[in-house]
A protein has these predicted regions:
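A short, flexible N-terminal coil/short beta segment enriched in small residues
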Residues: 16-25, 142-160
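H/E-rich (His + Asp/Glu) clusters that bind or coordinate divalent metals
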Residues: 149-236
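Active-site neighborhood of phospho(di)ester-bond hydrolases with catalytic His/Asp-centered motifs
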Residues: 13, 53-55, 79, 142-145, ...
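Active-site core of metal-dependent hydrolases
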Residues: 80-82, 111-121, 138-155, 182-191
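Glycine-enriched alpha-helix->loop->beta-strand junction motifs that scaffold or abut catalytic
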Residues: 72-77, 103-107, 136-141, 179-183, ...
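Distinct, well-ordered alpha-helical segments
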Residues: 61-71, 89-97, 119-134, 152-176, ...
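A structural motif corresponding to the C-terminal end of an alpha-helix
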Residues: 2-8, 41-50, 137-139, 173-183
Length: 236
């Protein structure tokens, strides 16, 4: 941290266990786990360099008190990876959770679209449209990587809606006036070869620029085969 530019701070993300429908942690179905206490302790130890992001599964029996505790302890956001954690953002079970987030102003940073780096769980939970429930409760939502990989069912078209690109569903919500000031896109990982096709599209949307946030997607940026600079040249 000694080499950080003055005034720069990095958010340290916790990562909760996968939980079943009864809210029980399923450690055998979890790729990794980073406790809130660990992320918070580092942020408190080095407050000039770090802030912390909590990760609390909404099905947990202690989800609401844990959420209040995280807010009191200075968490700046909540991290979800729905498919890997077993979270359905469209579930009514999340409503009280959403109410608290909306009242506190704490945002959710949620993956959307296909997930490859952290495998397991239910990929359908990554459908960007499932996050409408949080947005409609007034929760600020940051969709990681602008949902730039994979395909999902267009639920706006009903139960038989067509399967379309996840990015197109994200873009639709970004263009809805009611989500102005609530929905944001994270542009980390857009330079990876499986997502690079969206980079130019996102940059061309100048009206989105104030709502695009820069994450690191660490540690994947250090895995060089994931990047193909020649694809940027081809896109012009």
């Amino acid at each position: 941290h000694a080499g950080f530019p003055k005034g720069a701070r990095i958010m340290l993300l916790a990562f909760d266990w996968h939980h079943d429908e009864q809210g029980r942690p399923q450690k055998e179905h979890s790729i990794f786990h980073i406790p809130d206490s660990y992320a918070a302790s580092l942020a408190h130890q080095f407050p000039a360099q770090f802030e912390w992001v909590a990760s609390i599964h909404p099905y947990r029996e202690d989800a609401i008190p844990a959420l209040h505790a995280a807010i009191k302890d200075g968490a700046r956001a909540i991290k979800w990876l729905p498919s890997a954690m077993g979270i359905d953002p469209l579930s009514p079970r999340c409503d009280r959770y959403y109410e608290i987030l909306a009242a506190s102003g704490l945002p959710i940073i949620s993956h959307a679209g296909r997930e490859l780096a952290v495998q397991g769980g239910t990929q359908d939970y990554g459908n960007p449209l499932r996050l409408r429930r949080a947005l409609d409760h007034g929760v600020r939502v940051v969709i990681a990587h602008c949902a730039s990989d994979g395909d999902d069912q267009d639920m706006d078209g009903g139960i038989n809606g067509p399967v379309v690109r996840s990015y197109d569903l994200f873009a639709r919500m970004m263009d809805e006036p009611r989500y102005q000031g609530l929905l944001f896109g994270d542009i980390s990982a857009l330079t990876q070869r499986n997502r690079a096709w969206t980079l130019k599209l996102v940059l061309q949307r100048s009206e989105w620029h104030a709502r695009l946030l820069n994450g690191s997607d660490y540690p994947l940026p250090g895995v060089m085969p994931l990047f193909a600079p020649s694809s940027f040249v081809a896109q012009g």
